[in-house]
């Protein structure tokens, strides 16, 4: 990296003119050039050309200044450098190799097609369905965050999950968790079987059930941890070992956690899905999905499906995600802290029967969760034992918007059995322990005291 500062007569008055007017010393420099050329190594800065100060001056640098420069160089030479920046730093320091002008905001390449160099030669891009610089910038960043070989952005989380199911052929099997997002459940129970794929549903928190379900025909194991909405925790490491022993891939829907809190690929998963609509974009203004994958062979298969099916994310939607993702770590930190305090308040409330949140010490999966994630996130649920009370809470609060989805800066509240999970038959929901009085909360970035007070008023206004 080289930066320079030069004074040219075409831009400023000559030094002679300034000197004649008494505005500058006769011994002032006629040219100033500063060149900074750091050579980075794994853990420290090399002392060779690590800091070069080049001044062309009539007056030589005095001994004190020379000593200061040497001391600065020595300090830089011995400074320990982290092997990798933290997520919050990576998010705002995107290496945008797609922009020749180094704009601070990644450019939006709002185009459907690209001019080619000749009739028989192709440029780096030809048609946005197949690739676009704005999408590539987002995918490159997401791959880095998830420690993936490649990442791919889709028009929604469900489009991303649908692409994964197309990796499985007629007669092969998918083993999937029984407590998953309602849209995923609909895809697995009503759409995937049409192609001749066998779907087995198990409680992924019970390793013996998972082991019994995985067989020679199993090609994919699909799980969420924590699950949506009941916050059940599965052992991603051990399930990955079981699946790989049979030659199956492992998919983890990591939408509730995001790359800030969990990296399932490092735990053994092969594919990680994010609904980028949620924490990645963070503002409820765009739909998007992500698949982050390990291995070039798998990456090529996923790209083939994305390109062939036309499910790649549009440039403007990619740009919105790039804008939102810069504050993801900051948002999640605040949202998670709010969720923890609200969950603690609810867990001690006499009208609440149970709170499902892995961040609470008495959660049965608490220790397992924190062995594979950095935090519990900001989505949780609770039951009251009364559908009427739950309905009153959802409808009476003024700072929680009644809406599906989660991960927005705005706090959201819902009753999953009537909203996000309504497509699951009632008898199936009941068998899985998904009761109609269940309330799901996605904590936003508001003042937590206002949110707790809002809930408290709602409880107090419900007739006994």
From Swiss-Prot:
Its EC number is 4.4.1.13. Forms homodimers. May form homotetramers from two homodimers. Belongs to the trans-sulfuration enzymes family. GO terms for cellular component: chloroplast; chloroplast stroma. GO terms for molecular function: cysteine-S-conjugate beta-lyase activity; molecular adaptor activity; protein homodimerization activity; pyridoxal phosphate binding. Catalyzes the penultimate step in the de novo biosynthesis of methionine. Its role in methionine metabolism may affect plant development in different organs, probably by modifying plant auxin transport. Its cysteine desulfhydrase activity may be involved in hydrogen sulfur production using L-cysteine as a substrate. It comes from Arabidopsis thaliana (Mouse-ear cress). This is Cystathionine beta-lyase, chloroplastic. Its cofactor is pyridoxal 5'-phosphate. Residues 1-55 form a transit peptide. The keyword Lyase applies. InterPro entries: Cys/Met-Metab_PyrdxlP-dep_enz, Cys_b_lyase_euk, Cys_met_metab_PP, PyrdxlP-dep_Trfase, PyrdxlP-dep_Trfase_major, PyrdxlP-dep_Trfase_small. PROSITE patterns: CYS_MET_METAB_PP (PS00868). Disruption phenotype: Decreased abundance of several PIN-FORMED (PIN) proteins, involved in plant auxin transport, and impaired auxin-responsive gene expression.
């Amino acid at each position: 990296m080289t930066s320079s500062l030069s004074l040219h007569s075409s831009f400023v008055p000559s030094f002679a003119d300034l000197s004649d007017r008494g505005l500058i010393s006769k011994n002032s420099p006629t040219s100033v050039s500063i060149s900074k050329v750091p050579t980075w190594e794994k853990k420290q800065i090399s002392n060779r050309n690590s800091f070069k100060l080049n001044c062309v001056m009539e007056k030589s640098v005095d001994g004190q200044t020379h000593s200061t420069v040497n001391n600065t160089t020595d300090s830089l030479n011995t400074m320990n450098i982290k092997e990798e920046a933290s997520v919050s730093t990576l998010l705002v320091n995107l290496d945008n190799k797609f922009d020749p002008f180094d704009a601070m905001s990644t450019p939006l390449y709002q185009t459907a097609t690209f001019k080619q160099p000749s009739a028989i030669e192709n440029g780096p891009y030809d048609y946005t369905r197949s690739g676009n610089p704005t999408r590539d910038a987002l995918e490159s960043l997401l791959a880095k965050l998830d420690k993936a070989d490649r990442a791919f952005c889709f028009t929604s989380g469900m489009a991303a999950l649908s692409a994964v199911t197309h990796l499985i052929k007629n007669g092969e099997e998918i083993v999937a968790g029984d407590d998953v997002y309602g849209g995923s459940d609909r895809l697995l129970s009503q759409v995937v079987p049409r192609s001749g794929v066998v779907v087995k549903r198990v409680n992924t928190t019970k390793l013996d059930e998972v082991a019994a379900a995985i067989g020679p025909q199993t090609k994919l194991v699909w799980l969420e941890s924590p699950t949506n909405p009941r916050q059940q925790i599965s052992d991603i490491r051990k399930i990955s070992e079981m699946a790989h022993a049979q030659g199956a891939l492992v998919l983890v829907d990591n939408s509730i956690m995001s790359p800030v809190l969990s990296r399932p690929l490092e735990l053994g998963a092969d594919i990680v899905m994010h609904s980028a609509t949620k924490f990645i974009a963070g503002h409820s203004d765009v739909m998007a999905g992500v698949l982050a994958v390990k291995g070039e062979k798998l990456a090529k298969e996923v790209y083939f499906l994305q390109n062939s099916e036309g499910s790649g994310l549009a440039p403007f939607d990619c740009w919105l995600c790039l804008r939102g993702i810069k504050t993801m770590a900051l948002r999640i930190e605040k949202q998670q802290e709010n969720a923890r305090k609200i969950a603690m308040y609810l867990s001690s409330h006499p009208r609440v029967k149970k709170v499902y949140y892995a961040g609470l010490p008495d959660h049965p999966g608490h220790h397992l969760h924190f062995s594979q994630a950095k935090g519990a996130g900001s989505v949780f649920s609770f039951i009251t034992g009364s559908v009427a009370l739950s309905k009153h809470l959802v409808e009476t609060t003024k700072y929680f918007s009644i809406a599906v989805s989660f991960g927005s800066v705005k706090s959201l509240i819902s009753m999953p059995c009537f909203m996000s999970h309504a497509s699951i038959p009632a008898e199936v929901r009941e068998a899985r322990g998904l009761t109609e009085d269940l309330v799901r909360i996605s904590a936003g970035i508001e003042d937590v005291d206002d949110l707790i007070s809002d809930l408290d008023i709602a409880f107090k206004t419900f007739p006994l």
